[in-house]
Amino acid sequence: MPNTSFPVPSKFPLGPPAAVCGSGETLRPAPPSGGTMKAAEEEHYSYVSPSVTSTLPLPTAHSALPAACHDLQTSTPGISAVPSANHPPSYGGAVDSGPSGYFLSSGNTRPNGAPTLESPRIEITSYLGLHHGSGQFFHDVEVEDVLPSCKRSPSTATLHLPSLEAYRDPSCLSPASSLSSRSCNSEASSYESNYSYPYASPQTSPWQSPCVSPKTTDPEEGFPRSLGACHLLGSPRHSPSTSPRASITEESWLGARGSRPTSPCNKRKYSLNGRQPSCSPHHSPTPSPHGSPRVSVTEDTWLGNTTQYTSSAIVAAINALTTDSTLDLGDGVPIKSRKTALEHAPSVALKVEPAGEDLGTTPPTSDFPPEEYTFQHLRKGAFCEQYLSVPQASYQWAKPKSLSPTSYMSPSLPALDWQLPSHSGPYELRIEVQPKSHHRAHYETEGSRGAVKASAGGHPIVQLHGYLENEPLTLQLFIGTADDRLLRPHAFYQVHRITGKTVSTTSHEIILSNTKVLEIPLLPENNMRAIIDCAGILKLRNSDIELRKGETDIGRKNTRVRLVFRVHIPQPNGRTLSLQVASNPIECSQRSAQELPLVEKQSTDSYPVIGGKKMVLSGHNFLQDSKVIFVEKAPDGHHVWEMEAKTDRDLCKPNSLVVEIPPFRNQRITSPAQVSFYVCNGKRKRSQYQRFTYLPANGNSVFLTLSSESELRGGFY
């Protein structure tokens, strides 16, 4: 193997050779060389012998760099890297003042008394005057003040290393771009080691470093010298290879560490004698004098990008694009190392608004973390602290009360899928004005299409009758199904809160069991009457809803909904009376509203089993060949009875249809029988099911049938 020599920075003093930690080659006696002794003046200028076979230049370190960044601290020292096969692998270093057995005879000596090292090699004399005591190992050397140039004594150390290929990252273009030469860290580098660059950790570095791990410096010494060294943080040079490892977590700090040598640059802060301080993922108390230009790199950002970028220019561009714009606003301490507070983190000012009069004075924002804020008390504003102040309404929304475990807790309110009556005792919840039969619902990606309107203009009106108290109540509104099954919240449609200049009703939006519920106040001064001009209909994505368990039974083709209103009335005995009423069906699809028949009103909803009476249906999209089908279903949904009613085609209009009620299948029933009917314009063009009740037959049923037929012939229709 050819000898390879290259200069590397060194602060090693003159002394006997010593083996240090690492996996390299130990020193061996230098073979005789026929070269002559070079003068000390030539060594100061890094004179290179012409007999050098292979050289690998490395950048020399600046004398102002701290010892924490690199342990070899002379400006232009010379170290010869000579592979050796006679000694076990380890890092070793020999100095010029070692035993004579390592060098030539005493005749070939330098002016300073040191013998000539072997050739071919590169030999550079240090400018820095380093003094040492009796210690013979590198980690026992103490760095003293730099002497003037006239008093500096030359010192040369020899470091034998194994083959250079073992320390080179195959994807790196030069040793300067290795993972271990990313930056120079000060004593506050633990901030960036924990958060910014997980691949810079010495315990997780995949490539070994050709340099010996440096000695830890004292905080008093390392901090001032790091002022000039930390300018390297802004260097545009970055490693062309990315790291496949995840970020440093609490578990990785507590886990076992490997035994292989680690990279320098003060990443592992303990000396070469094996004394290892306790590693902690917590922040270092000493701040960094310069802000870090890097951003946090997490596991999510590294996965999938481990082999894509192999050029340092691409990595530099990515880092420039992802650099936090708020880094220059700080005081020099990296963003990741600062204490999390409201004045540092957010880019939008957050103002705390009292939720009610009983909230009291708001404590300072620095006394509690942001996660203690509630969503209702946060308002976004600009840095200029200007926003539109909206006057608070007289109606205060109910706040959740914190109850102790020993306090009495009343039963919870009924679920949204419970079937509740519309009247009970003196109370009745009634829809005074029904909504329009068609309303175009809007999607989440488009703008609102306004509030639901009434058929005759305006908006729906709901009123609670029989309530004589002076306390206001809350009217709840949600979107329910409009099929023939039991009423329940619709999975594909939600209520949408409408705001604007033309909205006169105050509303508040909450979520109950994945269903949006709009709360509207019912005030005694308004006779417990509310105009619903603040409710729209929102269409959710089918893919999002169908992933939920138990929601696919509704079907994406079910585009008809109802407005469901609820009110909870407290009783003197401590209980709560809940009433519910649902509106007429509302078609939310524009295409369905133009093609499917829709029944809005029927002239009668019950008749005796003998049938024969004329019934008028009002709605939309009725045709001359429209059919009306009466159906009786079993509890399991199976059709027990199905009959087509006769239609009067002469009286048929697009918005009205006259049919004859067919006789029921069982003429001897003793209790009312519930059936349904629908209008059909084709195979797949059916209206929603409408309810109808058959009554038991008696002596007056025949008279009622005959009288109704005579009224029809008299010209009522």
From Swiss-Prot:
Molecular functions (GO terms): chromatin binding; DNA binding; DNA-binding transcription activator activity, RNA polymerase II-specific; DNA-binding transcription factor activity, RNA polymerase II-specific; DNA-binding transcription factor binding; DNA-binding transcription repressor activity, RNA polymerase II-specific; mitogen-activated protein kinase p38 binding; RNA polymerase II cis-regulatory region sequence-specific DNA binding
Record-linked InterPro entries: Ig-like_fold (IPR013783), Ig_E-set (IPR014756), IPT_dom (IPR002909), NFAT (IPR008366), p53-like_TF_DNA-bd_sf (IPR008967), RHD_dimer (IPR032397), RHD_DNA_bind_dom (IPR011539), RHD_DNA_bind_dom_sf (IPR037059)
An individual GO BP term: aortic valve morphogenesis
Any one annotated GO CC term: nucleus
Sorted UniProt keywords: Activator, Cytoplasm, DNA-binding, Nucleus, Phosphoprotein, Repeat, Transcription, Transcription regulation
Gene induction: Induced in T-lymphocytes upon activation of the T-cell receptor (TCR) complex. Induced after addition of phorbol 12-myristate 13-acetate (PMA). Induced by calcium in pre-osteoblasts and osteoblasts. Expressed during osteoclastogenesis, its induction and activation is regulated by TNFSF11/RANKL.
Region named 3 X SP repeats: 205-300
Expressing tissues: Expressed in the submandibular gland (at protein level). Expressed in basal epidermal cells (at protein level). Expressed in spleen, skeletal muscle and skin. Express in the lung and thymus. Weakly expressed in heart, brain, liver and kidney. Not expressed in testis. Expressed in osteoclasts. Also expressed during TNFSF11/RANKL-induced differentiation of bone marrow-derived macrophages to osteoclasts.
Protein name: Nuclear factor of activated T-cells, cytoplasmic 1
